Amino acid sequence: MSGFDLSEVAGPVAEVIDDKNEEVEFVVFGVQTQPNKLVVDAKGKGGLEEVKAALKEDALQFAYYRTISGDEESKRVKFVFISWAGEGIKKPKLRAVMSILKGDVKNVINNFHIELHATSLDDLVEDEIAAKIKKAGGADYSFNTTSN
């Protein structure tokens, strides 16, 4: 246990998961150390680009977002979990918090298809993430594009 207050996590995560909620497709949580808790830094819609805009170079953050994946035969909602430790973090002790806290956060945010750890915005490339989601997704009908 990390000793961090995660009470503000479940509600916004439920908003991202809710199919009827068209206003919230992502949430970004910031790690606060005085007192130790996660707080909502940003939430909204707009996909990966808005998630990236909310990530801070000198912060520890967690992001959770909804995306659509699939092929012409089947489109499915997928969820991505990102742990972020910006390259601008100067205190090694703060970076160490990530390894302790990440497991606790994943106990609350436990519905995701892929998990990424990033330290630079260059680590978060839409096409690469889509490929990872597709690989993790199971069925792929793209090989059969003609009907029998």
Curated annotation (Swiss-Prot):
Main location: cytoplasm
Topological relation to the membrane, as annotated: Peripheral membrane protein
Domain of life of the source: Eukaryota
CDD domains: ADF_coactosin_like
Keywords tagged on the record: Actin-binding, Cell membrane, Cell projection, Cytoplasm, Cytoskeleton, Membrane, Phosphoprotein
GO BP term (any one): regulation of actin filament polymerization
One term of GO molecular function: actin filament binding
Similarity annotation: Belongs to the actin-binding proteins ADF family. Coactosin subfamily.
Protein's name according to its UniProt entry: Coactosin
Lineage of the organism: Eukaryota, Amoebozoa, Evosea, Archamoebae, Mastigamoebida
